[in-house]
Regions:
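Active-site-proximal beta-alpha core segment in soluble small-molecule metabolic enzymes
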Residues: 42-112
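N-proximal short alpha-helices
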Residues: 1, 5, 24-28, 69
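Short, well-ordered alpha-helical scaffold segments within catalytic/effector domains
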Residues: 18-25, 68, 93
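Generic N-terminal amphipathic, Lys/Arg-enriched alpha-helix
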Residues: 1-16
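N-terminal glycine-rich anion-binding loops that anchor highly charged ligand groups
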Residues: 20-51
Length: 112
């Protein structure tokens, strides 16, 4: 979408240069290959399936999220390996289990 006047945009919104995004993502993927590691982008800023796919070279690979709402959104789009990057509290475990069962995915946890 091309916008001539930034004041016309509904906020909050994400504004980015797709060419720069693609170059940065390519550089990150190449660096991970050099280090023999897996890229697991944190998608909390973009909250975008399209951007997650650009980051992962159009693959449905591992991602990192900050909310269970984000986890469910990406699970519904076919992402199967999701890291929930904040400490979980017991009352959220039911929803986490629901997401895993409904979308046949794995939501990994970080415990502190």
């Amino acid at each position: 979408m091309k916008i001539n006047n930034l004041e016309e945009l509904e906020t909050p919104c994400l504004i980015l240069d797709k060419n720069i995004l693609e170059k940065n993502c390519l550089r990150a993927r190449q660096r991970c290959i050099q280090l023999n590691t897996i890229l697991r982008p944190h998608i909390k800023t973009s909250k975008s399936i399209e951007i997650a796919k650009i980051a992962l070279d159009q693959e449905i690979g591992p991602i990192t999220v900050s909310t269970l709402q984000e986890a469910e959104y990406f699970a519904s789009a076919g992402f199967k390996d999701i890291l929930y990057a904040v400490s979980i509290i017991p009352r959220k475990l039911t929803r986490l289990n629901f997401i895993q069962q409904k979308y046949n995915c794995l939501v990994r946890l970080v415990l502190d």
